[in-house]
Amino acid sequence: MYAIIETGGKQYKVQEGDVLKVEKLKADVDSVVKIDKVLAISSDDGFVVGKPYVDGAYVEAKVLEHAKDKKIIVFTYKSKTGYHRKLGHRQWYTKIQITKIAK
């Protein structure tokens, strides 16, 4: 059984036991979050596609940690003027483990 969920503006194909890095969620570590934006769900009964979401379907996940991702370097310059700027950015993310997929 797998599901396609939407969180943080991105879509993920998940199964029970999967560990994902998603955009930062407002939840404490070791808490359980309920994701109800399920776009599609596949099981032994068949494949169900939502319009846009499947009614009554949800995915439960356990929050494992909050951390920052690798640093991304942004370098901007303008030719012939000597102007340049170097910036770094580290995006926050949440690591979750899928515990339950319900229809």
UniProtKB/Swiss-Prot annotation:
Cellular component per GO, a single term: ribosome
Pfam families: Ribosomal_L21p
Acyltransferase as UniProt keyword: no
GO biological process, any: translation
Molecular-function annotations in GO: rRNA binding; structural constituent of ribosome
InterPro entries documented for this protein: bL21-like, bL21-like_sf, Ribosomal_bL21
Keyword list, A-Z: Ribonucleoprotein, Ribosomal protein, RNA-binding, rRNA-binding
Entry annotated with the keyword Acetylation: no
Subunit structure: Part of the 50S ribosomal subunit. Contacts protein L20.
Family: Belongs to the bacterial ribosomal protein bL21 family.
Annotated PANTHER family: 50S RIBOSOMAL PROTEIN L21 (PTHR21349), LARGE RIBOSOMAL SUBUNIT PROTEIN BL21M (PTHR21349:SF0)
UniProt function note: This protein binds to 23S rRNA in the presence of protein L20.
Protein name: Large ribosomal subunit protein bL21
Organism from which the protein derives: Caldicellulosiruptor saccharolyticus (strain ATCC 43494 / DSM 8903 / Tp8T 6331)
Underlying gene: rplU
